[in-house]
């Protein structure tokens, strides 16, 4: 029988051999990428309407059919080396604009200061090459320690030695300006963010040409009237923030006042004396001086030249040697070892007081260049990036606050002085700025009703209430407690008597403490903080008949006590004792009440609660088991580069209450914003943060699983919204599924932003907007679901609203109900008798992260055996774990 098959049988070939141990590849299931939800139809309607003004300025646009052309910029020295120094690029490109206007087709460009420029319409060619020459700075061959002038080129003006620069401009892309026209109609398109970036670069270039310091989207003029000294040789410099924003009403320019920290310009020695609080340089800590001066710029009084500081000399000016190429009578050079002081004597330059102090070094490690400190002046507008002290922070807040009329006047003047409408690139773009504040309509939401002791209703007035002649909602008993005293000036007998009296008036049964106040042994007052704490606990153990359940700790200083961290660690981690630290300056009823509010909350009591928590007022929260979550990540202060980030998540407990919270805190990689420990499967178990909180809710809520999970996330920018949804929310969903595969709770995710620049002003008066003012139209996002809420009464400066973004809402809240819930959660903050500016769960997460940051000492963390967190990835620096709270306090509001 004939067949076309190779084997002649007419059958298909046999299947290939499959090994028995072969595991088939399964294509991973692709997850749907979540995006921020769209705004529901219609805005909220509850509340009394109020006319407002906002610091958004309208934008007109008359060139919808054009294009922004994007060009790459390469700047090289004449010998082909790339120019890498910051700052010089703008001078070079300004020279190109000035010299080659005709070659540029009479076009103006917007340059970002680095490697990009934009034009309106195309340049004559896709690739243009130019050469420019800048003014030459006089040689510095005679400066001590470097006769070849390498140090002159340390900062942005260094290339002036070579004078000539080669500039290459090449086409990269084009951006349709139609994107801006669409934004004016409230529509977002693919190219909108690129187009807005061009407009922002135009404004930055305008500020740079006025000699401003640029910090992201803020700019600061070199005007002493804008400098506000805050101590320590540091000043707050007031400037302006500006950015283009898309809104429901179209495109707007958001302008606000902004402040950055700068070093005190002038003699270096004056700055150091102020920075270290010294009367003369002989008591100076020169190691500290070296750290604070590094990379700052100085002007040399002998030549008016500028340099960047690389360090200090190892020896004093009179002892520091360097090799001087000294000219002789024959016009030749001979190398001579000489001290810096004698070098200046040889040059007949008097050094008055610097001989005993280190020199300023502006050279390279192998080629130092030294100047006596008295010849060095710090140039103006240099950012101070170290951590501020508590005193500096307080001074900054005090001196930079502006009442609404003052802020409005400042913004009006700033916009006028900037004169944006005269900018040639902005004119070419067809963009013009309306100089009037935008009018918007707000609503004042009804004030939520509170419940206090004996079931009594309490209605806050203007965002405030008090407990005068009232008791707390759930007062506790303070028993088996003691007073420990690290302060030598506190009248402890009066404090104890008044605290007991005030507590009983508020319904708290404060029993008498153990008989003796435990005072610190004076001989330990100058010992290290950990030694002082250990000694205090030795006294507690020997003097008290039983272990205490609560300790009231009196500190000498409220914010600067080095005892605070070790004390908290000993109590919360090692022993599980609830503690409250105080540093009383005056004992009055208000102070004692505030202390008792914290004590009551930490011991499991409840000071006040929302009336809706015990009523069916909001069925989606009070009729269905609901957990409310607050999340924040703390990254430490500027200058603390070796400190890990701290992630804190708090959650409500004892449903239907939404006023009590438990915290879970872990460390994670430095500067990582997304929380990576929410779901953490290890050996078949979930050791993540969210599981811990879900189990606490279950056991504290009579074995109920939450059917609704409402998440408030703090501290993320709009560019991170997708990560919140697709990383953090996904982890929480996985944690739920891991606990019970059949359990499918519904989620709502809301981001709370405080770090923005939108402000509101009453159009009919000088006061701040009333508490409860909400804005959800006109200047809100054209597509996404967001609103601004001023829940609190702004008593100082201008009220900063919180900007809430609803990213996800499976629960399906009506707009009014969701806004009412957010507003109400500003009234459950147990430490205060005022509405706060952001929902309480977010505040609690921030407090928990901050408190655990003080509990741990970075260098001790790796030695902690009972701990949480701790990540080690190949090639990464291990993250030290967070000490685990003692079981006695793990569910308490220890952070309150």
Curated annotation (Swiss-Prot):
Domain PAZ: 267-380
MF terms in GO: siRNA binding
Disulphide bridges, residue numbers: none
Tissue specificity statement from the Swiss-Prot or TrEMBL entry: Expressed in embryonic shoot apex region, pollen and developing ovules.
Domain Piwi: 550-857
Disruption phenotype: Differentiation of multiple gametic cells able to initiate gametogenesis. Abnormally enlarged sub-epidermal cells in developing ovules.
Highest taxon of the lineage: Eukaryota
Listed transmembrane segments: none
CDD domains named in the record: PAZ_argonaute_like (cd02846), Piwi_ago-like (cd04657)
GO cellular component, one term: ribonucleoprotein complex
Gene Ontology biological process terms in this record: defense response to virus; megasporocyte differentiation; megasporogenesis; plant ovule development; regulation of translation; regulatory ncRNA-mediated gene silencing
Family annotation (SMART domains): DUF1785, PAZ, Piwi
Cited Pfam families: ArgoL1 (PF08699), ArgoL2 (PF16488), ArgoN (PF16486), PAZ (PF02170), Piwi (PF02171)
Keywords in alphabetical order: Plant defense, Repressor, Ribonucleoprotein, RNA-binding, RNA-mediated gene silencing, Transcription, Transcription regulation, Translation regulation
Function: Involved in RNA-mediated post-transcriptional gene silencing (PTGS). Main component of the RNA-induced silencing complex (RISC) that binds to a short guide RNA such as a microRNA (miRNA) or small interfering RNA (siRNA). RISC uses the mature miRNA or siRNA as a guide for slicer-directed cleavage of homologous mRNAs to repress gene expression. Associates preferentially with small RNAs of 24 nucleotide in length with a 5' terminal adenosine. Interacts with 24 nucleotide sRNAs derived from transposable elements (TEs).
Family: Belongs to the argonaute family. Ago subfamily.
Protein name per the record: Protein argonaute 9
Organism the protein comes from: Arabidopsis thaliana
């Amino acid at each position: 029988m004939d067949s076309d098959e190779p084997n002649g049988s007419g059958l298909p070939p046999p299947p290939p051999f499959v090994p028995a141990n072969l595991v088939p590849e399964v294509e991973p299931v692709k997850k749907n990428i979540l995006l921020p939800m769209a705004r529901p139809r219609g805005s909220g309607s509850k509340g009394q309407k109020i006319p407002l003004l906002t610091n958004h300025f309208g934008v007109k646009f008359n060139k919808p059919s054009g294009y922004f052309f994007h060009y790459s910029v390469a700047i090289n020295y004449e010998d082909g080396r790339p120019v890498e120094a910051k700052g010089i690029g703008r001078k070079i490109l300004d020279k190109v604009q000035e010299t080659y206007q005709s070659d540029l087709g009479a076009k103006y460009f917007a340059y970002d200061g680095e490697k990009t420029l934009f034009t309106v319409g195309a340049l004559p060619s896709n690739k243009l090459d130019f050469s420019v020459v800048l003014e030459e700075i006089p040689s510095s061959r005679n400066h001590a320690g470097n006769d070849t002038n390498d140090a002159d080129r340390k900062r942005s003006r260094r290339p002036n030695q070579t004078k000539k620069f080669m500039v290459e401009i090449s086409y990269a892309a084009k951006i349709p300006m139609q994107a801006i026209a669409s934004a004016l109609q409230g529509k977002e398109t693919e190219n909108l963010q690129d187009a807005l970036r061009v407009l922002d670069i135009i404004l930055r270039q305008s500020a740079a040409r006025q000699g401003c310091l640029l910090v992201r989207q803020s700019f600061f003029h070199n005007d002493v009237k804008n400098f506000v000294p805050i101590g320590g040789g540091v000043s707050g410099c007031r400037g302006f923030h500006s950015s283009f924003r898309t809104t429901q009403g179209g495109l707007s320019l958001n302008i606000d006042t902004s402040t950055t920290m700068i070093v005190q310009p002038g003699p270096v020695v004056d700055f150091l004396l102020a920075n270290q609080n010294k009367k003369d340089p002989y008591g100076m800590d020169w190691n500290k001086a070296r750290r604070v001066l590094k990379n700052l710029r100085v002007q040399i009084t002998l030549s008016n030249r500028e340099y960047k500081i690389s360090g200090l000399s190892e020896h004093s000016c009179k002892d520091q040697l360097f090799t001087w190429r000294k000219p002789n009578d024959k016009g030749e050079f001979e190398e001579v070892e000489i001290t810096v002081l004698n070098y200046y004597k040889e040059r007949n330059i008097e050094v008055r007081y610097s001989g005993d102090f280190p020199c300023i070094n502006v050279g390279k490690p192998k080629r130092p260049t030294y100047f006596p400190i008295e010849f060095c002046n710090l140039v103006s507008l240099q950012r101070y990036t170290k951590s501020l002290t508590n005193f500096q922070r307080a001074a900054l807040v005090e001196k930079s606050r502006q009442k609404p009329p003052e802020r409005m006047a400042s913004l009006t003047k700033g916009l006028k002085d900037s004169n944006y409408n005269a900018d040639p690139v902005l004119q070419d773009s067809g963009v013009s700025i309306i100089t009037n504040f935008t009018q918007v309509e707000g609503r004042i939401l009804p004030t939520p009703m509170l419940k206090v002791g004996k079931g009594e209703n309490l209605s806050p007035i203007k965002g405030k209430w008090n407990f005068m002649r009232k008791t707390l909602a759930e007062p506790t008993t303070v028993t088996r407690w003691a007073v420990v005293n690290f302060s030598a000036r506190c009248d402890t007998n009066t404090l104890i008597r008044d605290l007991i009296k005030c507590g009983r008036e508020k319904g708290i049964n404060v029993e008498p403490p153990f008989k003796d106040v435990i005072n610190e042994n004076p001989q330990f007052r100058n010992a290290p903080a950990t030694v002082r704490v250990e000694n205090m606990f030795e006294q507690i153990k020997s003097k008290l008949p039983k272990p205490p359940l609560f300790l009231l700790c009196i500190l000498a200083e409220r914010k600067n006590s080095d005892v605070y961290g070790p004390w908290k660690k000993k109590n919360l981690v090692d022993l599980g004792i609830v503690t409250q630290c105080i540093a009383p300056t005056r004992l009055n009823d208000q102070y004692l009440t505030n202390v008792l509010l914290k004590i009551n909350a930490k011991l499991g009591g409840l000071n006040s609660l929302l009336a809706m928590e015990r009523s069916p007022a909001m069925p989606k929260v009070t009729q269905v088991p609901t957990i409310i979550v607050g999340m924040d990540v703390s990254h430490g202060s500027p200058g603390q580069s070796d400190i890990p980030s701290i992630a804190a998540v708090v959650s409500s407990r004892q449903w239907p209450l939404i006023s009590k919270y438990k915290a879970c805190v872990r460390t994670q990689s430095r500067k990582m914003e997304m929380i990576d420990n929410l779901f953490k499967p290890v050996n078949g178990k979930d050791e993540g943060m969210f599981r811990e909180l879900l189990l606490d809710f279950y056991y504290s809520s009579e074995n109920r699983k939450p059917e609704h999970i409402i998440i408030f996330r703090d501290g993320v920018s709009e560019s991170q919204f997708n990560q919140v949804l697709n990383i953090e929310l996904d982890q929480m969903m996985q944690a739920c599924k891991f606990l019970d595969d059949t359990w499918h709770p519904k989620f709502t995710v809301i981001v709370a932003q405080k770090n923005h620049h939108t402000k509101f002003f009453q159009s009919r008066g000088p006061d701040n907007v009333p508490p409860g003012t909400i804005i959800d139209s006109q200047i809100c996002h054209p597509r996404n679901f967001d609103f601004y809420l001023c829940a609190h009464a702004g008593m100082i400066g201008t009220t900063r609203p919180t900007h809430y973004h609803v990213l996800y809402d499976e629960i399906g809240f009506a707009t009014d109900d969701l806004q009412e819930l957010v507003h109400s959660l500003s009234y459950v903050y147990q430490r205060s008798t005022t509405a706060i500016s952001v929902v309480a769960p977010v505040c609690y997460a921030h407090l928990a992260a901050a408190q655990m940051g003080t509990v741990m000492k970075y260098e001790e963390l790796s030695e902690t055996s009972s701990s949480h967190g701790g990540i080690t990835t190949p090639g990464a620096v291990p993250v030290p774990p967070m000490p685990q709270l003692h079981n006695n306090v793990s569910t308490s509001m220890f952070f309150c």
